[in-house]
Amino acid sequence: MASLTYDLTLAGLTVGSAAALTGMGLVVTYRATGVLNLAHGAIAMVCAYLLRQLVVEWHWPLAPAAALTLLVAAPGLGVLLDVLVFRPLSVQGNDPARTLVASIGVFVLLVGGAALLWGPGARADAPALVTGEPWGQLAVVAALAALVVTVTRWTRFGGELRAVVDNRELAALGGIDTDRVASVGWAFGAFTAGLTGVLLAPYVRLDPYGLPLLVVEVIAVAVIARMRSVVVAVVAALLIGVAQAQLTRLHPAGRAEPLVQAVGANLFVVALLVAALVLPGVGTRDALSRTTVAAVRIPPAAWLVAGVLLLLPLGFAGSDLHTSVQVPALAIVLLSLVVVSGRGGQISLGQTAFAGLGALFTGWLSQSVPELLALLLAVLLVAPLGLLTGRPAIRRHGLALALATLAVSVATSRFVFAQPYATSGLTLTRPAGLGDDRAYYAVELALLACALLAVAALRRGRTGRALAAMRDHEEGAQAAGVPVPALKLVAFVVGAALAALGGGLLSMGLRTFDPGAYDPVRGLLWFAAVVVLGADNLLGAPAAAALLVGLDAGTRGGVAAAAVGLLALLVGRFPQAHEVLSRWRRPPKPPPATARKVYALPAGPAPAAAPELAAHGVRLSYGSYTVLAGVDLAVPPGRVTALVGGNGAGKTTLFHCLCGTLRPDAGRVAFGAADITRRPAHARTRLGIARTFQRIAVFPSLTVEENVRIGAEQGRVRDPAAVEQALRLMGLAGGVRRLPAAGLPTGTLRRVELGRALAGRPHTLLLDEPAAGLDTAEAEELARVLRALAADGMAVLVVEHDLDLVADIADTVHVMRAGRIG
């Protein structure tokens, strides 16, 4: 028993040391650049192939081949990626969404390129750099960890690295060469990736898809380390590796045996799932940037051409449509990304899980019920599983959400699709009468048309506008009354249903369930393809499906991945291309109006009927620093109340407590007799509390009228004239109402934001520095509007630094100092 424990521990240390190298590389790269390098596994795979090429094919000695691979090629690839891709992105603002798209593009490009160069098959003759004993690997890991800790803590470069991590712009102003720091980080990260690939290749399948996925799984150790601590990453990797090895000795009897064995063989996947779904996430931004998902106006002729191309196989192809039947099914799967990522802006890398589950459930159920009924039931069963990724999306943003969705995909692949207990003996048959490829293809086209119409209706309607608002500006959407958490769940559930429908059709068309068709690497490829062809465009999904299927069928394996990866990299690197396309065929702007008339609000309820918003003893602290120290404030109806004070006085914090975006530690917020302290922002909006933002919160992808309409729809205003009245009041009733909000002048955008707030017919209006960015004439116009609103009985609170504006409009002025009103 002791000998077995020792042997298993050694095996676990071997795996854990490779995982530790990955963790170190990811942490150092992230600390130096702010980029979570999802292409780490692909770099590892390329280096493993390069070493094999040098040693096995070209008969180089191992030592010089390893030196060239690890000390020249791997760091050189890292520096190349930094200089050509990620450094320009950091100069342009380091948008996490664009960086993620570029990183996925690099991953897919390297995987596709490797498949092109070396073929998609597995290789079993990779050279071993060290012996089978783990001590050599452990020594390398310990030495590298000690080097990283020493450099980061006790050298000048370490101080520069910490400065860049804390504030890259300020570090550059302080004379630090941030580009050099980033290049060193990328070189070291690529070196550890190459070393990981070289060490793992002799013991696993060396193929373009398997090895990158293995490295992706051990991202868990970097997440556990919060992307900051090399020591924590190394310790976590070694512990998980040893625990995974020890679990292989468990052989419980009964139905639990396959599951226990699966967990024992995939403990890093379990760790990734827990780290991604339970531990606090990394990343801050929640949505794909608007330039990345920008919708291109599609002329009717393009739809006509697409329809003709999809119908061509029915008339001109032979009876064997094996390739063609994949296109409509895959297009439906990719439509799920149009809903979730394109319209909703949520980064989802796990749609392969839902597509595969749709195929799997269809196969299971078709053994008992007719095939079409089995497909329908599969869709209904898989749709609620969208909550697995939708729930984390409520709290997780950006990179954290990407990791959560990727973790769900990896776990589903390892614990369901790859297990014999789930897929052994599974066959899929087509419905009666659809055995012929032509008939089946025609049914697929009909279902694709229905799916396109359903998604088009969703995008054009109230829900579609709310999704676009959530994508463009989540806090602004909440302020407009959009129930963002519920809407995210809806997007992921609808996306799961579409993916399940497409997955079921795809496997029925091929008459088999192929786990490889739904592996996580393919999910990254699907995501990249949809982003490349326009994530918010309905035509993008069929086009991406045709591109992927056509290239894979008509060319050497890997062409589709390489092409899509290159295009995704370029889209992440040059998002302006999508921005230019989004302006295509946009109607010309009308000439600017020479004057804007401000209309009085129509007569409304008596002012006495409006509830009073009040804060009672509100306290809030950040650690030991007290921001609000028992603040009392009332915002009475029919009056303009102003809140002024110096920077750091607590004005904005109190404002957020009133809006619902912050919850106080003590005290309460009341609206009339109701205690609304615990109510979220969108719920307060629906009570009649509207707000604007210091930094303008409009939805650039929507027109001016759609921006205002969201305020009425989400505020549940039943009067159809509410939108028109708000547009007229703010001087937006002319041709400007049909223009997208993107690119409009600041003064116009301020009026759009205020018009959206007023369209909800609020009782109380909260304004955070509403005059910011306005010229004198625009500020005077704003003052007239606010006085008119108060005269009509509305309660108005203004947080403002412009004391002239405050003196002009305020009935009551409160001064804040050090978290108190006095």
Region spans (language model):
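Transmembrane alpha-helices and adjacent helix-loop boundaries
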Residues: V15-A18, T22, G41-A44, V91-A126, ...
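The feature captures the beta-strand-to-loop junction immediately N-terminal to the Walker
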Residues: V644-G646
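Helix-to-loop junction immediately C-terminal to a conserved catalytic motif
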Residues: C659
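Conserved ABC transporter NBD signature motif
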Residues: G667-A674, L687
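Catalytic Walker B motif of ABC-type/P-loop ATPase nucleotide-binding domains
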Residues: L765-E769
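A short, surface-exposed alpha-helical micro-motif characterized by mixed small hydrophobic
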Residues: V806-D808
